Amino acid sequence: MHNDKDLSTWQTFRRLWPTIAPFKAGLIVAGVALILNAASDTFMLSLLKPLLDDGFGKTDRSVLMWMPLVVIGLMILRGITSYISSYCISWVSGKVVMTMRRRLFGHMMGMPVSFFDKQSTGTLLSRITYDSEQVASSSSGALITVVREGASIIGLFIMMFYYSWQLSIILIVLAPIVSIAIRVVSKRFRNISKNMQNTMGQVTTSAEQMLKGHKEVLIFGGQEVETKRFDKVSNRMRLQGMKMVSASSISDPIIQLIASLALAFVLYAASFPSVMDSLTAGTITVVFSSMIALMRPLKSLTNVNAQFQRGMAACQTLFTILDSEQEKDEGKRVIERATGDVEFRNVTFTYPGRDVPALRNINLKIPAGKTVALVGRSGSGKSTIASLITRFYDIDEGEILMDGHDLREYTLASLRNQVALVSQNVHLFNDTVANNIAYARTEQYSREQIEEAARMAYAMDFINKMDNGLDTVIGENGVLLSGGQRQRIAIARALLRDSPILILDEATSALDTESERAIQAALDELQKNRTSLVIAHRLSTIEKADEIVVVEDGVIVERGTHNDLLEHRGVYAQLHKMQFGQ
């Protein structure tokens, strides 16, 4: 078991390495800086031997005169190398994290809808944000610890000397000065942390919008828009992180410089005869100092494996997602605009992970330009039929045709470009009204075309009342709009899309009667000259359909016009009686 685990860890790191490799120049610079940093510590302690034996033992005042300058120089070198190593490692880490996040984001946008059916939004957001950040600990924190502390231990074990009680007084002198420095730096930390939290919220929001609006992204071809949006906020987060690292890295050298100045003062004061008489042997001081100095690197090395394993565990989680199969897009047929004929032939479909088919032996033909309505109780399979037209799921048996060709023959982008979707749960993006209407195609449509679509959707009345009209930002998922207003924005989006096939999935079921009347005219306008598949609970909205299909437990049980089905006195007539009491 232990060997298997080690092999798994090594394989994970080997797979992570290609992500780190492009930034290896930063690793090389950091490695050199870390070795110089550890060497400066070791050389600092090595100076205690000539200092105590020659400077104090033989009362050679010249040693005590130049030694403080050497000490200050070494501490400055240590501070500079510490800053360079921390900054370079964090630069590499930030690049690795951003690269992993972008890979995850892009991969998730290509995942099938069934993947999101089985995953919670919070879990996926955690993968993009927190788990990606954890990867940094395996590529940065562990490297810093092993190189710096390892070099320090090797040097310190060579030079063991004792510590003097006089030097311990330095801690008392340094305490108030260091506390002031920490207070100043902490204020800077707080300001940067607030900016980082705000930026992380933007990253999370961008990812959440893509995840919650995954169907809209797919159907409207918004992958590039969402990728650019996410790249922008992700890079902004990286820059904020570098500001935090810069402030953090400079704090240690400042405190160390303060300590070196205090130590230099003690060394200079030691040249006075009254002080020299009270000093012990140099070897005792050096050994004791080395022993104390060894405590920190030993403790760090003890914890480095746990740190490394956390990073590797995060890598394995992310690679599990990256290894998940994306949507199959094997079709070759590309079509500019379909006629709109849609036909289901003996279609059977089962949701992934379930045993009972959601649809069984479905045969349905929707002629171009006609309207077919699907009715039935909740869970009967109506929305499933709509989802199959856009290939959000692939069927088990049978075939679905568009203009006489199997849907699987078309490229996904070409197929979904033929379909406009208006559902009960409208997803709007935290953007302007205009950009929501022209989603993923803002450069393709003119301002006049956007306004015309909004007018035809009876949306300009409330849009004109907004502070900035079409340029008003509507908040996350259109939080500033009512249900009816959000639906009209969605209808305007579908009108502007001008696709030959229209799916209305419970488009008015969540609205009150007044709101439904307000958008019914817009829906009628939208359905003109389009192949329409309407899913509705309210039977009053589909009475004019060319054909009404009744679905029960995944099977078509009735079909016909409104009047024909009422005369048949079957399931549709019962549903109609339940709603209208007739």
Curated annotation (Swiss-Prot):
SUPFAM superfamilies reported for this sequence: ABC transporter transmembrane region, P-loop containing nucleoside triphosphate hydrolases
Pfam families in UniProt: ABC_membrane, ABC_tran
Residues the entry annotates as binding ATP: 376-383
Example of a GO cellular component annotation carried by this entry: plasma membrane
Domain ABC transporter, chain residue ranges per copy: 342-578
Keyword tags: ATP-binding, Cell inner membrane, Cell membrane, Lipid transport, Membrane, Nucleotide-binding, Translocase, Transmembrane, Transmembrane helix, Transport
Gene3D superfamilies according to UniProt: ABC transporter type 1, transmembrane domain, P-loop containing nucleotide triphosphate hydrolases
Topology term for the membrane: Multi-pass membrane protein
Subcellular location, principal: membrane
Subcellular localization: Cell inner membrane
Domain ABC transmembrane type-1, residue spans: 28-310
Family note: Belongs to the ABC transporter superfamily. Lipid exporter (TC 3.A.1.106) family.
Summary of subunit composition and partner proteins: Homodimer.
Record-given protein name: ATP-dependent lipid A-core flippase
Organism: Escherichia coli O6:H1 (strain CFT073 / ATCC 700928 / UPEC)
Lineage of the species this protein comes from: Bacteria, Pseudomonadati, Pseudomonadota, Gammaproteobacteria, Enterobacterales
